[in-house]
Each structure stands twice: as C-alpha cells, then as structure tokens.
A protein has these predicted regions:
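Conserved structural position within tetratricopeptide repeats
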Residues: 52-55, 87-90, 97, 102, ...
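TPR-repeat structural position
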Residues: 43, 77-78, 124
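Alpha-helical segment of the N-proximal tetratricopeptide repeat
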Residues: 25-56
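Short, conserved micro-motifs composed of acidic
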Residues: 28, 99, 103-106, 113, ...
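Structural motif corresponding to the intra-repeat A-B loop/turn of tetratricopeptide repeats
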Residues: 40, 74-75, 121
Length: 421
C-alpha cells in the first residue's frame, strides 16, 4: 500500500511539473485528436497521445482503458494491454460519456477488452470469468451478448484443442528474407521458387520479390517503383505459374483489388479489377483458380451474410469478371471470413474465419470440394498453427499439406517473420 501511495505521489508530482509547460486547452486538443484516431482505428497514432495524457492525469481511468485498447490492437504489444485494462476495469462508470474530456471513469467495454486480452494471453479461465462478469453487468439490448457467449465458447474450444495439438514442422525462412521489421502476406508460386511479400520499412510498406537460386532465396528486390504504386498496396495472392500478382489497396474509404502481370522479368503497372469485384464496399483479399477462370475474394457488400464474406466470380465471354456469387452459409458466417486461398489442384479452400469452431479471433480453416462440386463443412486446421489470437493468410502449397504463414515469435529476426510449414 505504501508503495502504491509513493507511486501516486510521484505521478502527481510529474503532472504538476508537466502542466506548467502544457496548457489544459492543449491537452484537450490532444485528447480530441486521440479520440479521432480511435474512431479511424489508428491505434499507433492514438497510443502515445493517451500515454502522454496519462502522465498528466494518472487517476483518469478512461486513459488506462484507451491505452489498453491501443495495445490490444497493436501486433506484438498485446500482452501490455492487460495491466492497463485491469486498472480500468476496477473503475467502471455506468454513466460513461465517450469522447468527453472530463470523463475519468472507464466504460463496461473495459471488461470485454480485458477478457479478450486474457484469452490472447492464454489465461483462459480468467477470460471466461471476465466475459461472464461483463455479461452480468451490461444491458443485452445495448451490447451484443451473443458475441460474448461465442467468445466464451472459443475459450472452451481453445482448452480442448491445446490438449490435442497437431504435429507440425516450422522453419523460419531466414535472414535473407526476414529482417528487423515485419515481413507479412507471403505469396508463392506452385514450384516454391518465386516469393513475393510485403515488408514494413521505416516510412512505408513495400512489396518485395525474391527468387530461389541454388537452394537459397536471392536478395529481395523492392517492386514498389516497378509496379507504379505507393505504400498503400499489399500482396494478396500469386498464381501457380508465378505470373499474375493480386494486390489489395486501401482507397480512401474502401478496399479494392488490383493485379499486375509478369512479362519476362518485368512486372506491369497495377490495374484495378472491374466493378463486379470492386464496389463501394470493402474488398480485402482475392485469389485465382489454377486456370485463372475463377476469382475468390472477400467483401462486406450488401449480399454478405455478415461482415466480410467470401464470394466467387467467373470470367465471362469477354474474358472479364462476371457477377459475383456468395459462397453461402456453409463457408460464410454471421461473423467475418477473410484471406481465401486454393490448393494447387483447386480442390481445397483455405480461409480464415471468426465464426466457425474457433479457438479465438480469426482461425484458419480448410474446406474440401465434394463430388457434386460443393464445398464441405470447414475444419479447423488445429493448434499450434491456430492460436487464441488472430491467425490469417495461410498460403497452401501442393495439396495443402504444406504452407507459408507470417507470425510474431520471440526467436524471430524482427516483428513478423515468414515461416514455412
């Protein structure tokens, strides 16, 4: 108790000294700016602002809540959210006023986010207990309690799946590919000799290309200038022959799919796909069938069952993409589905979902095509490929018994590294 009082005294003293150099109106502007960042889900921008505000106001539990929320949405930093959310959850204001500078309490959401943080940290008993606590406190007409019940189910699924792990052999692609920043969204040709991925650089994200030579990956080349693009494009998929690259771009208020073609050793400028694929809604990922006649992609357009769904489109007589069709309720759920990929024989669909038999967040699933040409019930590919956090972008090779994936690891070269399974 004495230690806590001493800490509070030091923080209060820091506030007193700091306030002399920063006016209350400036702090209010900082708060408004941070709240705007949260609105647009720009947690990296919001975090230092809330940390600064917390130095000035160490007894404002709204700032503990916001800092915890930011860490929970920052890859590689999620474990830091727990202590802040625990503090916030002990100081709930039932009349919480979001966006108000004078608000000093935390909302009930702090409990929900704390439960998520426990789940991601594999503290599953604590997660279940905290989800239950949240359910007892909130009005079911205001909060989606069905989602909370589903989250509780995922915790029980996780406990079961972690007792029965699948056998995997995982290999980091090494420092020729992975560096101190993040490498993610790997896409690879069927012969596993052409690899493209997105790399986080100091000031922007860039598309890189590497070829396998003499059993080793050659030094990756930054393709961003050659593709005629800026930092808003991300690798989405690569055809088996390695000659057609699909990319995803955030275009102001929506996401769209683009393509580039390889001729010789030169990639073409990117071209936006037609209006049957790209709409005013959010298109986030796409992949092509082996013959290039079908495209599977994700969108939250009005025909979706819920959130992002997987759609398919076939080429018409002109060679362009025809109307898109929802894959239906066997694949799509009331929650999100994303990052679909096909095995090299087009018989197995791999994708990530928040709404099937999950162990937490997005999990990777596989669905096999039956004799009638219909996709079968999705099967979770298991732990430890799937975890209690979000798992996306599993790129299968061969018949899907092997694949590539990016993830954070304490023994990696940087943030996210690319692994082969």
């Amino acid at each position: 108790m004495r230690r806590a009082k001493n800490l509070l005294y030091v923080l209060t003293l820091m506030c007193t000294v700091s306030l002399a150099g920063q006016t209350r109106s400036e702090l209010r502007e900082m708060f408004i700016s941070a709240e705007g960042d949260i609105l647009f889900e720009d947690y990296a921008e919001a975090l230092p602002k809330y940390l600064n505000l917390l130095q000035f106001f160490p007894e404002n539990y709204n700032y503990y809540y916001r800092v915890g929320q930011c860490y929970l949405n920052t890859s590689g930093e999620k474990d830091k959210s727990i202590s802040f959310l625990e503090t916030a959850a002990q100081n709930i204001n039932p009349q919480y006023r979001e966006g108000k500078f004078r608000e000093t309490g935390a909302p009930y959401d702090a409990l929900y986010y704390l439960a998520n943080a426990y789940r991601i940290g594999n503290e599953l008993d604590k997660a279940i207990e905290t989800y239950d606590m949240f359910m007892k406190e909130v009005d079911p007409e205001v909060y989606d309690t069905n989602l909370v019940r589903f989250q509780i189910e995922t915790c029980y699924h996780a406990l079961e799946m972690m007792r029965k792990p699948v056998y995997i052999v995982e290999k980091n692609l090494g420092d020729g590919i992975n560096q101190r920043f993040s490498e993610f969204n790997p896409v690879i040709s069927a012969d596993e000799k052409s690899l493209l991925f997105t790399r986080e650089l100091q000031f922007y994200d860039a598309v890189f290309w590497s070829l396998m030579k003499d059993g080793r990956w050659a030094n990756p080349m930054n393709l961003t200038p050659e593709l005629g693009i800026d930092q808003d494009y991300y690798t989405s998929s690569l055809t088996g022959d390695g000659k057609t690259l699909l990319l995803y771009r955030i275009d102001r208020y929506d996401g769209n799919i683009y393509e580039s073609k390889l001729s010789g050793d030169q990639w073409s400028d990117v071209k936006k796909l037609n209006d049957n694929i790209n709409t005013k809604y959010w298109e986030s990922h796409a992949t092509l069938s082996r013959d290039g006649m079908k495209i599977y992609f994700t969108s939250n357009r009005k025909e979706s069952i819920g959130g992002l769904d997987i759609f398919v489109s076939e080429r018409d007589s002109t060679g362009d993409w025809g109307p898109a069709v929802n894959l239906g309720p066997v694949i799509n759920t009331v929650y999100d589905e994303d990052t679909p990929f096909l095995s090299n024989n087009d018989r197995t669909l791999f994708f990530s979902s928040r709404g099937h038999y999950n162990m937490g967040g997005y999990d990777i699933f596989r669905s096999d095509l039956d004799e009638k040409g219909e996709w079968g019930t999705p099967v979770n590919i298991g732990y430890p490929v799937n975890t209690t956090d979000d798992d996306l972008f599993f790129v299968p090779v061969g018949k899907g018994d092997r694949g590539y994936l990016s993830k954070f690891s304490s023994d990696g070269y940087g943030k996210m590294d690319i692994y082969r399974y």
